[in-house]
Regions:
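Signature for HUH/AEP ssDNA processing cores
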Residues: 1-92, 99-108, 168-169, 179-183
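DNA replication initiation modules
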Residues: 32-60, 100-189
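Short Gly/Ser/Thr- and Asp/Glu-enriched loop/turn motifs at secondary-structure junctions
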Residues: 88-94, 126-131
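Short, well-ordered, mixed-charge alpha-helical segments that flank or form enzyme active sites
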Residues: 94-95, 142
Length: 190
């Protein structure tokens, strides 16, 4: 990094973090927030993507996690066909984007996938406002045509109903204010 003493690990780390903060971002759970304010309270339930990103932050797990992601995607488990995207992160670790199994919350999905993949669970990745820094094309390993794709209306309805039947909101984020077992799922309060 120009102007930074390569022998000063602390200065190099600080400079890299500064460069990282200049990268564009992507929200991993929602595509819309009220008043353009990225927070849990302002996440618009109808904009829930039904996908999440597993963030492999320990370099010792990257190669094994990459192989396991491919293996799980082809397995006869709930993870079959769920892999949406693989990329190296800004710090050359790994992001694994997956479609959430029907009825599972972000936290449930993250915990179950990490267990199946044999990688550490990172609870900081389950917040509605979570973002990931976008890296260059060379960092992309795999991209499904379904990544950030709009799900069919019937699938969205089925996924929302699966949450509602559990007493959760349509995005699985919290407790529904009232139970809805039939009808539409348009109210942001549900």
């Amino acid at each position: 990094i120009p102007g930074v003493d390569a022998g000063d690990e602390k200065a190099v780390k600080k400079a890299r973090e500064g460069l990282k903060r200049q990268l564009p971002i992507r929200a991993i759970h929602y595509y819309k927030f009220r008043n353009n304010h990225r927070s849990s309270e302002d996440a618009v339930p109808e904009s829930f993507l039904f996908q999440t990103t597993i963030d492999v932050d320990d370099v010792d797990y990257v190669d094994a996690a990459l192989e396991k992601a491919r293996e799980l995607n082809c397995s006869n488990t709930i993870w079959k066909g769920k892999l949406l995207h693989l990329e190296y992160s800004a710090r050359k670790k790994l992001h694994i984007d997956i479609r959430m199994p029907m009825g599972m919350t972000i936290e449930e999905t993250q915990k179950a996938y990490c267990e199946a993949a044999g990688i550490p669970y990172d609870k900081s990745c389950i917040t509605p406002e979570r973002i990931i820094f976008i890296t260059d094309k060379d960092s992309e390993i795999y991209r499904s045509k379904e990544w950030y794709g709009v799900l069919p209306d019937e699938e969205i309805k089925a996924r929302r109903e699966a949450f509602l039947k559990r007493g959760l909101t349509i995005d699985g984020k919290g407790t529904a204010r009232y139970s809805l077992l039939a009808g539409d799922c348009k109210s942001p309060e549900r």
